[in-house]
């Protein structure tokens, strides 16, 4: 018996050779069905969940633990209870720590801090004498970061690797009746040096704990390899079954579709019997093959699954137990420089996904997983990378079932190590590396959804990677291996897998330069496909120029897509002292080593509501595209392209609508039937009389006819909008004949009134500002319209993701140096004159900062008797200024009601920015004031709508060619707030009207990533806006 003091002295948690002790060999998940029909139907598995309330106590370090807690008679009455699975930091113990690169402790591998929070767990399990006739194994699916296990006071073993199962044989330690399990979990171990992923550091038993009962003679593992013939028509299964049984025992395999057998039973006996060093029989291996003519193929589009039942029979043919696995017939290969599935080159519409729950941390329920998968499919994702570790076992089963391609990634990242490859090249760590990779492959090898293995993430490149790669190609040559480290194109990867390489621009400020992806595939002797393991960093208001990636993917066959970073904002639910909810990020728990909001870079919020960026991703990744080929006044010819590689559009309907000046005037629908990977032409009959100078658009929505497993009937899978030519002539111009309004100058006041006194404007000639604007005595604004050059910085503007200090090249730093947002305004001149039909008030402003004039603007107001004001703004900027955030104006309007409707004719309905508007459609949109604001967890500028021609807010209508946003928050408040609960909604509406607005960027979030064509580099701008009463 191993004493507790010996375990403390041995310090397995600081020894990279002690990966696991007494753990059973990794294998595919086992269920031990005692009936073949049960195995076929997946019912009555011999698995007992040990999830529930366990006794718990947290100690400061392993040395502080009372070793008697392992004993059955230990009095734990004063201990707390904690749910298993859970992370103890989210149950009121210890604190979460978020870091992207930095280790949250001093780097001195393999040693960890002496201050090493240690959670001790206890639970009791009752077993009958009949239970003890079988072997009993306990499986911990995930424990962070390392643990020792005791059963009835006897030490059982040790394990680390937070993201893979640890399985122990408890049979010899159990008794009939009540049994006590005790677990000691350390927050830090040497394995923590290999788990430096961009996520929260959380601890505890956070995945399921299961007791598996198996007969003495049993199936230990099954390895299934599906194959397709050269024509990708007929299929076969290679099945390797490992058993612990006498040589006279047999293995039967049979394939089912539902309850129907599709092959005859195949029975075989073991081969290659060996006697091990203990003089006993070693595991026996049985090789079998099944053939099936023209099986239904598995793809993400058509996730057809069969079920293989593998049964152990004794020498008399008596059934002992069965295991069963879903089977998908598919073939993954790289040929002609492309990653192919069933002979077709894939286009990876992928996303990186962390296992994150806003209340439960790293605990994921099946409902959470299904919700994520359905959202992914609804937004046109077909692939997921398990960034950066093996996921919960159930995740892969659901990906098999619903249809997602999976890049399965080993739990290895040493991002904070200097150099990054330090441990990757160290033979002392080779066993730890190999264990993490091989055990992942051994667990997950039978899932058809897994089409790529990944050696890990951001660990440089070293001999340990080469060893993993070599083992993988030998053990499972049916799947390619990818790895980004060391330049994305080392000999340890079958796929060029860069992160954040750009479409056309060289990223040269890296240790290893990242070529433009278009150039990368044309480098000499480079024949591999390129799939970005990470791209389009979706941090906050981001994803600018995403459509450029997809244009390149569709143009160049060896550019085969990528995985967006990333799926979900890793915010944790918290409440402030006033009971107001907010999403917490790094530093909010007193974690001094942190990377702030860099964990907030998802396409969806923590509660799974969607960001506007997800709309752009959905559009660019759509599987069905529609383009306008021909147009007459009576008809349009559309080209419909089905980018699905394996399925006809047999459940899709094309709904179309004709818009006149943003309003629908005609609709129609047509069922689609387009063969996989092909095109067809459709003719749409139009029945309308065009109006002079009206704008016409044809919208198409491709919708599901019937519900699927991942979306309801009517779900829109793809949209398109096409501008149509107007065949009508021009409209006759309207001449203004009304008299000019009345102009009065009184001291510093310039007052303009309509002749009926209904409309009145008043300027202060000293400030040059329009101080009052009344209609029927009712104020139209609360503060004067003013030039606006500032935006509350976006995460991409700040550019401080991986360093403590602001990069001087970051937009926010350049804007601060130029004083943008701090300029002093001086009125140079304010004058007025009466014309034949209008009064003109002209004001010139100079903006000063640092002793220099930074900008000069001239506002020319042309006022008509009917209450219309035409505003002409001329802007001249100093040559030394950096590209500007925006060119526009802001005015403050009264707030009449909280749900004030905002109606506009322009791009929408969701938020869009100049470099992120491919998904937006021109139309007449109405949303409430609240809907116009996007509550980014780290507050920034939000809510812009581009391509606007007309806008109504309250009783005010604005027309022109502009972009706008409305908000109850001042820009400065947004700039200063760190969380949404810091924002206090004002009793007014901030209306921002922009002539030009800089793009948001998003190739990455730590360098200035706004493309040049979306930067405001000109030094002269001029724009016009027309204001009028909405009731006019």
Curated annotation (Swiss-Prot):
Binds 2 magnesium ions per monomer. Binds 1 sodium ion per monomer. It comes from the Bacteria. The record marks 354, 388 as: Transition state stabilizer. It holds the Pfam family LacZ_4. The active site is at 458 (proton donor), 534 (nucleophile). SUPFAM superfamilies: (Trans)glycosidases, beta-Galactosidase/glucuronidase domain, Galactose mutarotase-like, Galactose-binding domain-like. Keywords: Glycosidase, Hydrolase, Magnesium, Metal-binding, Sodium. Its EC number is 3.2.1.23. The keyword Metal-binding applies. It is an enzyme of class 3 (hydrolase). Belongs to the glycosyl hydrolase 2 family. Homotetramer. This is Beta-galactosidase. It comes from Vibrio vulnificus (strain CMCP6). The gene is lacZ.
